[in-house]
Amino acid sequence: ARRDLVFCTAFNLLDEIEEALLGGEDDDVIRYGLQNTKSRITGTHRHARFVTPAFLDSGLEGFLKESYAGQEGNILIHLKTIVTDFSTASPTVITGSNNFSRSASASNDENLLIISGETAAADIYVTEMMRLYDHYRFRYNIKTRSGGGTPGRLVLAADDHWTDRYYAPQSLEYYERVRFCAPE
């Protein structure tokens, strides 16, 4: 990827693929990733946020308690898709039954479809992937919230200090603002 990267993966990624998804320390590619199982890339990095599905043990107010009843295993994300450079005129969508693992690539009869330059296809995939990503990022943040207890009430700030992170160079929020909203 030269500009941005969104991915949803199931499990057991090849080391080379995991390394490529993580990227280098000095690149400014924005990355969003959702993996079914926690790995070394889970969390927030300089230009990226990676999350895993979180099963909430207790219900949130107004929601039912969740259950794995009737489900075999712990697969919550089984979408296997990588989209690169989706905000450009030359995106690439990689999708199929291959889960980017060694066995899928070497011994299983799996497939991958590579769609290049089709902005409409990239838009559709990224929209669905970001829907899943935002949903599970909320759950991941609730599940990994430090301190536990009830979070404080959210209120509007009386001044504009809440915007500081969007103007701090090298922050993910800065790169998101510049990339998706407007140049400085």
List each model region and its residues.
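PLD/PLD-like phosphodiesterase catalytic module centered on the HKD motif
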Residues: 3-4, 14-184
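C-terminal active-site-proximal or functional interface alpha/beta core segments in diverse enzymes
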Residues: 10
